[in-house]
Amino acid sequence: MLLLAAVAASIALGSRAIPLRGVYDALTCPDGWPLTCAADGSTAQIVRELRLPRTGLALVCGLALGMAGALIQGYTRNPLADAGLLGINAGAAFLAALSIHLLALTTPAQYIWFAFAGALLAGVAVFGVSSVGGGKASPLSLVLAGAAITAFLQAMTNVVVLLDGTALNTYRYWVVGDVAGHDPSVFQQVLPFLIIGLLLALAAGPGLNLLGLGDDVARGLGVNIARNRALGLAAIVLLAGAATAAVGPIAFLGLIVPHLARAWTGPDYRWLLPYSGLVGAITLLIADTLGRLIARPGELQAGVTLAAIGAPFFILLVRRRKLVSL
């Protein structure tokens, strides 16, 4: 019910409030029948062409980032981990900025594939570097490799944006993180990757429960540790990479959402993963809607709104409750 309420509010509220009856008519009435509908032509255009694609993008990206955050915290055993820890955000940012600089791309629909490729390559690089030497990617080696690759990619991104003022202007809008102003094709481009990532994440849940007992115990119970970690990292890269490429790095979402979901489901990842996706979708929808209402008739980007709300909330969460050991 809360998800439906968040979706309805996202479509109905903004610089111009639309009654729910008007939203319903705009979605259901065929063109050419204005006399029988409460929605006029401009209302139908706002709902169908602006708010509905925006709401859909927020829904799927919030779901993806929430599930990716739960997976990252589980595999790294770090309750403060998110997509930035594995270099995914930095990889997406670097290739997005580089493509803007070299190819003069200006819209998210144009550079989304480069951002996704950057996230994918960064995730593979982190997994590869963390596996060097011991032959397996332990939680500690994943964190260290992610930190090193993130620092390198951030430095390269800074070089690109400082060399090109146009790239800086386009990049700084994307890097804030927002679901507004995206062509509907962006939703269609990322949806297949998000679906595949969702299925991989759900498949990785049972094995992740056993990995939480320790590698030796999990191995004794018959878990193929390398295969399970590879499955989980593939899900993380697809979910977080596609969502970040589409809307930019959304701060705090992948960090806070798993803790909220864990309060309802407990540590069982078979339930934690879908609930994290549900809470992530609701959270991003609410943040986007609040951003439209707070600065009306303008708006605040969802990334700014979520950071402003999420930072004090997370501090309160840490002070009132001890973080669950992962």
What feature does the model see in each segment?
Residues 1-326:
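Alpha-helical transmembrane segments in inner-membrane proteins
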